[in-house]
Swiss-Prot record:
Keywords of the record: PQQ biosynthesis
Cross-referenced Gene3D superfamilies: Coenzyme PQQ synthesis protein D (PqqD)
Organism: Bradyrhizobium diazoefficiens (strain JCM 10833 / BCRC 13528 / IAM 13628 / NBRC 14792 / USDA 110)
Top-rank taxon, per record: Bacteria
Gene transcribed to yield this protein: pqqD
Listed NCBIfam families: PQQ_PqqD
Protein name per its UniProtKB record: PqqA binding protein
Known partners and oligomeric status: Monomer. Interacts with PqqE.
Primary role: Functions as a PqqA binding protein and presents PqqA to PqqE, in the pyrroloquinoline quinone (PQQ) biosynthetic pathway.
Record bears the keyword Protein biosynthesis: no
A Pfam family it matches: PqqD
Family: Belongs to the PqqD family.
GO BP term, pick one: pyrroloquinoline quinone biosynthetic process
Amino acid sequence: MAGPRHISVSEASRPVLPRHAKLKYDETREVWVILAPERVLAPDEIAVEVLQLCNGERSVGDVSDQLAAKYAAPREAILTDVIAMLQDLADKGFLTEAREKTS
């Protein structure tokens, strides 16, 4: 059986939550959580915004462009922070690389 697919996040990466993980709003606690088998992670508001943009189609560069435009912040600073955050989530098994669609 294959283990988790570890990724190295870069500007060209197209990250997505793996099938076993879901980003959901917990209405009882009024917080966003990432639910995975036997694991729960409560990301902060910024992480939630980044994760909502990570749909497997957008690259990390695209996500950074959107956030830099929205917050009128330097793109390179946003990109550095986004890569670091996503790499941390990937290292913990909460993120994977989107697979190419085959037809």
